[in-house]
């Protein structure tokens, strides 16, 4: 039993050292889908939706801002960017946005939240 206080003290010291080595992380998150839709002949949708998201992650050593944009036009048109996700992932200290694959700029969980927001607003 004499080893118990020494072991607890040693473990407390190790935990304190390990926890001090992690940096603090903060994030800002917002996803919005704005739609202007109506039904055409009670069947097909007509109008458009604009989906945007911003995910800013800051740690002790760096900061990254990821942006998402998708414009959806109903009925579909010939615009090659219709219904195409466009993303950027840029260090916060830079003004020129860097294009990025959306799967790199956003986590799978964040992309799922964007899709959920979009789906909820496209119902008419």
Swiss-Prot record:
Q: Which residues form a coiled coil?
A: none
Q: Which GO terms describe its cellular component?
A: extracellular region
Attached carbohydrates are found at 36, 62
Chief localisation class: secreted
**Could you tell me what this protein is called?**
UPF0375 protein Y45F10C.4
Sorted alphabetically, the keyword list is: Glycoprotein, Secreted, Signal
Record's family? Belongs to the UPF0375 family.
Where does the record say this protein resides?
Secreted
**For this UniProt entry, which residues form the secretion signal?**
1-23
């Amino acid at each position: 039993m004499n080893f118990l206080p020494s072991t607890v003290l040693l473990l407390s010291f190790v935990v304190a050292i390990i926890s001090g080595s992690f940096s603090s992380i903060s994030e800002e998150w917002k996803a919005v889908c704005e739609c202007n839709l109506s039904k055409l002949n009670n069947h097909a949708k007509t109008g458009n939706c604009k989906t945007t998201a911003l995910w800013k992650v800051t740690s002790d050593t760096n900061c990254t801002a990821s942006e998402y944009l998708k414009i959806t036009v109903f009925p579909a048109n010939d615009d090659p960017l219709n219904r195409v996700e466009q993303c950027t992932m840029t260090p916060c200290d830079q003004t020129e946005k860097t294009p990025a694959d959306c799967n790199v700029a956003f986590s799978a969980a964040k992309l799922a939240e964007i899709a959920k927001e979009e789906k909820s607003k496209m119902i008419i």
